[in-house]
Swiss-Prot record:
Localization of this protein: Host membrane; Virion membrane
Protein name in UniProt: Inner membrane protein pE248R
Name of a matching Pfam family: L1R_F9L
Gene Ontology CC terms: host cell membrane; membrane; viral inner membrane; virion membrane
Membrane topology: Single-pass type II membrane protein
UniProt keyword Cell division present: no
Lipid-attached positions, N-myristoyl glycine: G2
Subunit structure: Interacts with A151R.
Principal location listed in the UniProt entry: host cell
UniProt source species: African swine fever virus (isolate Tick/Malawi/Lil 20-1/1983) (ASFV)
Topology Cytoplasmic: residue spans: 2-199
Regions that span the bilayer: 200-220
Family: Belongs to the asfivirus E248R family.
Alphabetical list of InterPro entries matching this protein: Virion_mem_poxvirus_L1
Length: 236
């Protein structure tokens, strides 16, 4: 949150996890009742005052196959961290490589606690719910009324201890690093200034060493030239 002291909430994290799961499962969801199908396709469409009463058809075998794919949890954790970024949650440590990456914390939390069977069950709860499909760029849909499919996933997740542990862990991680960012803002500036001065000092030392080296070489060459001249004078 870039220096903000506000607390990220459990509810926000739950919504982000639900949204991420829903997005990961889009390929397993199709529409029922083609007569009432509402879809927005193409670019630049503006749709106002939409009332939707549609049902979802859920391909359970697709869901089962999808959640068991090797990269599913990785993709899900990437989706969640990206959604956190989109919500302006600070996912940086002020360029300080010495602090543990909270993105790694979030990924490990998901891998340990958010089991694929739980995800499959919560997605299966969507069967019969409503959905609005919008595809393309620059589309605007306003005043749309529909049942919240993602809320069904949220309610399912809140009924599982594993999911609660995941959500709590992610929320604590975000708040921990946001607190670090806020608490250490001026420390970071001081460290940056100190680093600049250190770099200047290092550069100054290098320049001095180069100058000393040139002087030493000049003195050495000058001494050899003087010795040769003295030898020539002695011979003459």
């Amino acid at each position: 949150m870039g220096g903000s002291t506000s607390k990220y909430s459990f509810k926000n994290t739950t919504n982000i996890i639900s949204h991420s799961i829903f997005n990961q499962m889009q390929n397993c969801i199709s529409m029922l009742d083609g007569k009432n199908y509402i879809g927005v396709f193409g670019d630049g469409n503006i749709i106002n005052h939409v009332f939707q009463d549609l049902n979802l058809s859920l391909n359970t075998s697709c869901v089962q196959k999808h959640v068991n794919e090797e990269n599913f949890i990785t993709n899900l954790s990437n989706q969640i961290t990206q959604n956190l970024k989109d919500q302006e949650v600070a996912l940086t440590q002020w360029m300080d490589a010495g602090h543990h990456d909270q993105k790694t914390d979030i990924e490990e939390n998901i891998k340990v606690n958010l089991k694929t069977t739980l995800i499959q069950n919560c997605v299966s709860a969507l069967s019969g719910m409503n959905v609005l499909v919008v595809k393309g760029n620059g589309n605007i849909v306003e005043n749309a009324t529909q049942k919240q499919s993602q809320q069904i996933i949220s309610n399912c997740l809140q009924g599982s201890k594993q999911a609660i542990d995941t959500t709590t862990g992610i929320t604590n991680t975000v708040n921990q690093y946001s607190h670090y960012t806020s608490k250490n803002f001026f420390d970071f500036i001081a460290d940056a200034i100190s680093a600049v001065f250190k770099n200047i000092m290092v550069a100054a030392v290098v320049i001095v060493l180069i100058i000393v080296g040139f002087i030493a070489v000049f003195y050495f060459l000058h001494s050899r030239t003087a010795m040769r001249r003295r030898k020539k004078l002695n011979r003459s």
